[in-house]
UniProtKB/Swiss-Prot annotation:
Sequence ranges of Basic and acidic residues compositional bias: 555-581
Signal peptide boundaries: 1-33
Residues with attached carbohydrate: 69, 181, 293, 309, 351, 392, 406
Name of the protein in its database record: Peptidyl-prolyl cis-trans isomerase FKBP10
Gene: Fkbp10
Length: 581
């Protein structure tokens, strides 16, 4: 189309005309009707395609971009922007277009299509354009509007979806990761991050983005979706960008914010559940067992200890895990649930790791602390109840004891109980028959006393665990001492309360035949016990103990004991010392 008095192919006019679009009820559209056969007084407008949504209509002073075909009444084409593959980009209502086009574009929506009939006095008048448009020509235009903006425009941000929980909003100097679809105002797609299989990662307010995007992302929450409309002077302006973004184009971005952090961020802690009576908190050097769910800021799960049905076990504050977790686990209580938000510079940095944690990703861990201990921990003993009467004798190494117990993990998981059996547990203290921590915890008890024992794994089943007991697990025992008997010295199966008879063999040889078979030996020992003169090793089968005693005295294993063979253990020990000397 043409400037008045110019040969350039654009529609122009030198003076500003008021908006004169008037409704008409003609079948062809809008405009001022003329009597039949009379010349048109105004532009006739036919809106033959109106988009469902029209958030904005063209007003005087707006900048528009549109395509058109121009023909005469007989259908002969005199001009077309399509033929030049170039949109018309111009300001409406300031005299740069012929008056008829200025009026015909007013009130138009993006993607609307109109047919305009422009009478000569609103087109090129009685002069026309030499060689192209004859004098007094009525002009027919088919127009589609692709873009509209104004110099007074700002970035328009519309929240499409905002999560109910917003831990933080984007601010200048933050680093963000987001997905986007980018289109022109008419819906033509020019770019999207999804096709590249990765987010767009950048700093905000540092000049790395077009100005409108810098502004449009401010205030967003992780997981939020926004529609951001950017006028060209806050985008790529008069030059456009490559072949995909034309000059003076408004841009529309549909953005999903996945992540936001600031290089100055520290680890953020949120206590979700704190058990009552927290008497100890984890410190650097402790060994901890915990469950966790690890997710990205948008909620995408990247790892979980629950899926492996096994806690994560590690030292805290020793560099075995990412720095953010090392920091975030310190100060936790056993049984506590806490949320640990770790910025990327305290996690896996800009490179990420594997195929589930992208570069520059903020990580969120929902942690349940099962237990922790320190390699220097002793058995922790707490008396729950003690008999009211005086307790003159307490359990010690070598004692034979009977006791009841319940054993669980610190999270309450039940492991074992003596109450599942018909009788209490029986052991000789110090005989290495139970875990070391339990053995220690049972020492110094009164009969009838109840205790709580917390046993660290290095005094229990260690890092490998045992059947039903996880590796590196701290164990909780509730024990009750039922009975206690003095034990025998190491290596002894039987002891006398007083010095034995000087005629011991003769006393054993019941039939006086000079030898003692198993039956006589057993009868003699049992009689000593029944008469209160001596006692067998407690906690053992008496017959088995007596049989072992007989085997020890039957030196030549001929099934009988002679006077030469019979020796007290104290005499044997003395002979051994003499031989060694």
């Amino acid at each position: 189309m043409f400037l008045v008095g110019s040969s350039s192919h654009t529609l122009h006019r030198l003076r500003i005309l008021p908006l004169l679009l008037l409704l008409q009820t003609l079948e062809r559209g809008l405009g001022r009707a003329s009597p039949a056969g009379a010349p048109l007084e105004d532009v006739v407008i036919e809106r033959y395609h109106i988009p469902r949504a029209c958030p904005r209509e063209v007003q005087m002073g707006d900048f528009v971009r549109y395509h058109y075909n121009g023909t005469f009444e007989d259908g002969k084409k005199f001009d077309s922007s399509y033929d030049r593959s170039t949109l018309v980009a111009i300001v409406v209502g300031v005299g740069r277009l012929i008056t008829g086009m200025d009026r015909g574009l007013m009130g138009m929506c993006v993607n609307e299509r109109r047919r305009l009939i422009v009478p000569p006095h609103l087109g090129y008048g009685s002069i026309g354009v030499a060689g192209l448009i004859p004098p007094d020509a009525t002009l027919y235009f088919d127009v589609v509007l692709l873009d509209v903006w104004n110099k007074a425009d700002t970035v328009q941000s519309t929240i499409l979806l905002r999560p109910p929980y917003c831990p933080r909003m984007v601010q200048n100097s933050d680093f963000v990761r987001y997905h986007y679809n980018g289109t022109l105002l008419d819906g033509t797609a020019f770019d999207n991050s999804y096709s590249r299989g990765g987010t767009y990662d950048t700093y905000i307010g540092s000049g790395w983005l077009i100005k409108g995007m810098d502004q449009g992302l401010l205030g967003m929450c992780p997981g939020e979706k926004r529609k951001i409309i950017i006028p060209p002077f806050l985008a790529y302006g008069e030059k456009g960008y490559g072949t995909v973004i034309p000059p003076q184009a408004s841009l529309v971005f549909y953005v999903l914010l996945l992540d936001v952090h600031n290089p100055k961020d520290t680890v953020q802690l949120e206590t979700l559940e704190l058990p009552q009576g927290c008497v100890r908190r984890a410190v650097a050097g402790d060994f901890m067992r915990y469950h966790y769910n690890g997710s990205l800021m948008d909620g995408t799960l990247f790892d979980s200890s629950y899926s492996r049905n096994h806690t994560y076990n590690t030292y805290v504050g020793q560099g075995y895990i990412i720095p953010g977790m090392d920091q975030g686990l310190q100060g936790a209580c056993i049984g506590e649930r806490r949320r640990i938000t770790v910025p990327p510079h305290l996690a896996y940095g800009e490179n990420g790791t594997g195929d589930k944690i992208p570069g520059s990703a903020v990580l969120i861990f929902d942690v349940h602390v099962i237990d922790f201990h320190n390699p220097s921990d002793p058995v922790e003993i707490k008396t729950l109840s003690r008999p009211p009467e005086n307790c003159n004798e307490t359990s010690k190494i070598g004692d034979f004891i009977r006791y009841h117990y319940n054993c669980s993990l610190l999270d309450g998981t039940r492991l074992f109980s003596s109450h599942d059996y018909e009788a209490p547990q029986e052991i000789t203290l110090g005989a290495n028959k139970v875990i070391e921590g339990l053995d220690r915890g049972l020492q110094g008890m009164c009969v009838g006393e109840r205790r709580q024992l917390i046993v660290p794994p290095h005094l229990a089943h260690g890092e490998n665990g045992a059947r039903g007991v996880p590796g590196s697990a701290v164990l909780l025992f509730e024990v009750e001492l039922v009975s206690r008997e003095d034990g025998l010295p190491t290596g002894y199966l039987f002891v006398w309360y007083q010095d034995p008879s000087t005629s011991l063999f003769e006393d054993m040889d019941l039939n006086k035949d000079g030898e003692v078979p198993p039956e006589e030996f057993s009868s003699f020992i049992k009689a000593q016990v029944n008469e209160g003169k001596g006692r067998l090793m407690p906690g053992q089968d008496p017959d088995k103990t007596i049989s072992d005693m007989f085997q020890n005295q039957d030196r030549n294993q001929d099934g009988k004991i002679t006077a030469e063979e019979l020796k007290l253990k104290s005499d044997e020990d003395q002979e051994r010392v003499h031989e060694e000397l």
